[in-house]
Amino acid sequence: IYPAEVEATLLEHPAVKDVAVVGVPDEEWGESVKAVVQLEGTAHASDALALELVDYCRRHIAHFKCPRTVDFIEQLPRDDNGKLYRRRLQGAW
């Protein structure tokens, strides 16, 4: 699974301002896909929105590529050049 494909799909959703997709430990599969989403200003984090984002992915890409979980964050950790600190996100889970 390429994170960029899942991220590009989620970025098309109007509630998503920025997103990072990371692999996290999973007892059943060894690792599963998690999306960490920074919302647009008018969107509000909720369980319903998390389910909507997973469903949105399933309508646009193969189910096995879609995140199993979605977490919301105020600001994704990026350096001055805009590069994502992906390991910081993975370490949080």
Protein language model features and the residues they cover:
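AMP-binding/adenylate-forming catalytic core of the ANL superfamily
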Residues: 1-65, 74-75, 80-84, 88-92
